[in-house]
């Protein structure tokens, strides 16, 4: 976890500046969140002729929120709402609170968005969302998400056109409990192996955090520090063997002393490239 204030998300620069060899390696949470939202919007636009299950002109979605206080969960909820136009500003940022139930579009936490395709305008509405916390207090709970989709589907029926989740664990629980049998696209995050495989069965898509690039960055930063060479060696600058990462798979923020792997949308167009997690990442395999 990146050193930061758990309430505000402000980075702990004292920790990140501990010494000259201190760096953080992770993934760009905001870029991934935006990408998930864009992936969902693109899917809706590409499938607009069939996605509105009851033909009411409203593209209704439900949202499984992992943990209302977790930075990644907050970012992903905001990313979806931003892309779909359902976000409402709260103190300078999109409100990430769960809406509860909003079938009539009257909530003050979200608003109705719009999507225009082929000259026709459709309303986009967050029908319901909740934090998936179980009775023991565990968040990101898959079983709770499975129960939630059964409750939502019983109440909203064919108003639900899209299912969205902050991660694949909850997403796959909802997919297996209801979405798959009802041909409702479900979108998650993490590119878990079961979710990637499920794309062939109708799972809408997921986001890969480029774990291979994260692993390489971590090992490379350590290696460079131990070898006493420039920290960028084999990362943005080729090493003696020619290993180097391209700028479309990582970014470095000098002010934050942080390397971030860039996320990738995994959809029906490319999921086969992600089925085997043991494949060596070729650009840095020399």
Annotated model-derived regions:
Residues 27-37, 55-144, 215:
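Extracytoplasmic ligand-binding site segments that recognize negatively charged/polar headgroups
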Residues 1-13, 184-190:
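Short beta-strand elements of ligand-binding domains
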Residues 80, 104-106, 111, 116-120, ...:
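Hydrophobic alpha-helical
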Residues 57-60, 64-68, 72, 84, ...:
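Hinge/cleft segment of the Venus flytrap/periplasmic-binding protein
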Residues 9-11, 17, 23-56, 75, ...:
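Hydrophobic alpha-helical segments within soluble ligand-binding/sensing domains
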Residues 19-21, 58-60, 86-91, 122-127, ...:
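Loop/turn elements at helix/coil->beta-strand transitions in domains of secreted/extracellular proteins
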Residues 158-165, 175-248, 255, 260, ...:
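Exported/periplasmic ABC-transporter solute-binding proteins
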Residues 39-50, 54, 82-90, 148-155, ...:
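Structured segments of extracytoplasmic/periplasmic soluble domains
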């Amino acid at each position: 976890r990146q050193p930061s204030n758990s309430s505000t998300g402000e980075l702990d620069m004292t920790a990140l500046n501990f010494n000259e060899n201190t760096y953080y390696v992770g993934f760009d949470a905001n870029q991934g969140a935006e990408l998930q939202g864009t992936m969902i919007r693109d899917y809706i636009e590409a499938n607009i002729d069939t996605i509105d299950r009851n033909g009411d002109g409203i593209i209704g979605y439900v949202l499984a929120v992992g943990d209302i206080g977790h930075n990644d969960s907050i970012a992903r909820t905001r990313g979806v709402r931003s892309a779909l136009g359902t976000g409402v500003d709260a103190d300078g940022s999109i409100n990430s609170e769960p809406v509860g139930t909003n079938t009539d579009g009257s909530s003050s936490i979200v608003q109705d968005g719009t999507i225009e395709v082929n000259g026709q305008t459709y309303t986009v509405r967050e029908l319901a969302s909740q934090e998936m916390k179980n009775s023991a207090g565990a968040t990101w709970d898959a079983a709770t998400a499975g129960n939630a989709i059964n409750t939502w589907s019983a109440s909203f029926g064919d108003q639900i056109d899209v299912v969205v989740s902050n991660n694949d664990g909850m997403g796959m629980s909802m997919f297996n409990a209801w979405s798959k049998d009802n041909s409702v696209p479900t979108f998650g995050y993490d590119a878990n192996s079961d979710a990637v495989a499920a794309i062939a069965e109708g799972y809408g898509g997921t986001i890969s955090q480029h774990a291979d690039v994260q692993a390489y960055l971590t090992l490379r930063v350590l290696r460079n520090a131990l070898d006493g060479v420039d920290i960028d060696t084999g990362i943005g600058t080729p090493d003696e063997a020619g290993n180097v990462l391209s700028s479309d798979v990582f970014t470095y923020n000098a002010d934050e002393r942080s390397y971030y792997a860039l996320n990738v949308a995994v959809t029906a167009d490319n999921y086969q490239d992600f089925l085997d997690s043991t494949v060596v990442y070729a650009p840095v395999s020399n």
